[in-house]
Every structure is written in structure tokens, then in C-alpha cells.
A protein has these predicted regions:
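Residues that scaffold the ATP/ADP-binding catalytic core of kinase and kinase-like folds
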Residues: 61, 83-84, 114-115, 156, ...
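Residues that recognize and position ribonucleotide moieties
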Residues: 32, 51, 73, 97, ...
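Phosphate-/nucleic-acid-contacting segments
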Residues: 158-225
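Cyclic nucleotide-binding regulatory module and flanking cytosolic helices
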Residues: 1-36, 85-86, 118
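Cyclic-nucleotide recognition modules
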Residues: 21, 27, 73-131, 135
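Polybasic "coupling" helices that flank or enter modular domains
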Residues: 117-188
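Cyclic nucleotide-binding regulatory domains
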Residues: 12-13, 38-100
Length: 225
């Protein structure tokens, strides 16, 4: 399998303008295709590898003792998978499953650590990544305990939205599916569908083929509880 032009975009983000970092990543990485639905990592695995998503989407998932699926997060192109286990030397704490066909750069854990030791800017970016993920996990734990299912959906919609040309509106683009939104939050699809339909009836959102528009961001934010 050969490197493609799009692959280099994911690497360039972490190279941070330093050509040597990008070249070092390519030198130690091998490419792998992961079909949709395939487990890249299984909980409890003791793999000596780190993964950089070049294309596609990977979902981090754990299962409760009763078999209930809990979605920890969704990782897109340009994001790392398995970096914590590489740094701690521990077993993998969650499943990593391809949500769509994906291309992955596979790095030996030792090479990943060497990159951090060699390039300070790379180490700083990885440290920032770990801090952001810890903050996101803490936020989700708080929301799970403090908010209703509807409140968590409202909060996630605002979080995923970006401003558009109309300063009074927010946009979710590309448009998420109800199934994807439910999975992100570990909420039943039927519940999520009812909440979204209610927002449409209240004329707070408009669902279009390519995007969702939040017509009244403040009103939606005020409903979070």
C-alpha cells in the first residue's frame, strides 16, 4: 500500500511546519486499511502500536457488564488512537472500531515515544491532545450525571455547530444522522429522534440534506438541563 496525497495532510498537522517530523513519521509507519465495522483495537489488547487516522472515522467504545454500548468519542482523520496505552504501557481500555472505511498509519509505540523525545513541538502537541481529551471526558461525565437525555442532545448539537454567514444561526455541517448523534451520546435512537422532531416542531432547528441549521442558538442553550 502506497502513501496518497491526502495522507500527508494528516501528517502535516503534527509536523507543525517541521519537515523532519513528517519524514520521521512516514519512515517508521506502515499503512493499513480498516473496513467499516472492523475493530482496530479490542478492550484488553496489549498491542505495542499507535495509530494515526489518515482517512475515515474511528469510534472509541466500551461495553457495560450488561452489554450496553457506551460511545466515548469519535475520532476523525488527523487524530491519534492508542497514544495513552503507548505512553503508559498498559492494556487498551476501550474498543476502537471503524465507523466507516478508514486508512491508518501504524507506528510502533517505541517509535512514537522516540518522536516525542526528539521533537519538542511534537511532544507539546501530543500533551495538548491528551489534556483536551481529558477535559472532554470530564465534561461528558458531568453532563451524563447532570443533564437529561434531551439536555445532552442540545449540548452536543451546540458543540458540533459552527457560525455561518447569518450571525443569528449555527450550522451542523455535514449533517449528522440521528443514528450517529444517538451513538455519540449513548442515547437510544428513538429518544434522539423524538427530541430532534420536537425541536423541528418548535422551529428551533431546520434539517437539510447537507446541514442542520440551529435557528435560535440561545433558546436551545437555555433548554439544556
Amino acid at each position: 500500500m502506497n502513501w496518497e496525497d491526502g495522507d500527508l495532510d494528516a501528517i502535516a498537522h503534527w509536523a507543525n511546519g517541521e519537515l523532519a517530523i513528517g519524514e520521521a513519521i512516514q519512515a517508521v509507519a506502515r499503512l493499513r486499511s480498516v473496513p467499516s465495522g472492523t475493530a482496530l483495537i479490542r478492550e484488553g489488547d496489549e498491542l505495542d502500536e499507535v495509530y494515526l487516522i489518515l482517512k475515515g472515522t474511528i469510534s472509541a467504545i466500551v461495553y457495560s457488564s450488561s452489554g450496553h454500548e457506551i460511545r466515548l468519542g469519535t475520532l476523525e482523520a488527523g487524530e491519534w488512537v492508542g497514544e495513552v496505552a503507548a505512553l503508559t504501557g498498559g492494556a487498551r481500555s476501550a474498543f476502537a472500531i471503524a465507523a466507516r472505511d478508514s486508512r491508518i498509519a501504524v507506528l510502533p509505540a517505541a517509535s512514537f515515544i522516540t518522536l516525542m523525545e526528539t521533537y519538542g513541538s511534537f511532544a507539546t502537541q501530543i500533551s495538548r491532545l491528551l489534556s483536551e481529551r481529558l477535559a472532554a471526558t470530564s465534561r461528558r461525565m458531568f453532563e451524563f450525571a447532570a443533564f437529561s437525555a434531551a439536555g445532552r442532545i442540545y449540548s452536543e448539537m451546540i458543540r458540533l455547530s459552527v457560525p455561518g454567514q447569518d450571525a443569528e444561526q449555527l450550522y451542523l455541517s455535514p449533517a449528522p444522522s440521528v443514528t450517529e448523534l444517538a451513538a455519540r451520546l449513548s442515547i437510544a435512537r428513538e429518544t434522539t429522534s423524538r427530541v430532534i422532531s420536537r425541536l423541528e416542531r418548535m422551529q428551533l432547528i431546520v434539517r437539510e440534506p447537507q446541514q442542520w441549521r440551529v435557528l435560535a442558538p440561545k433558546a436551545l442553550s437555555d433548554m439544556i438541563n
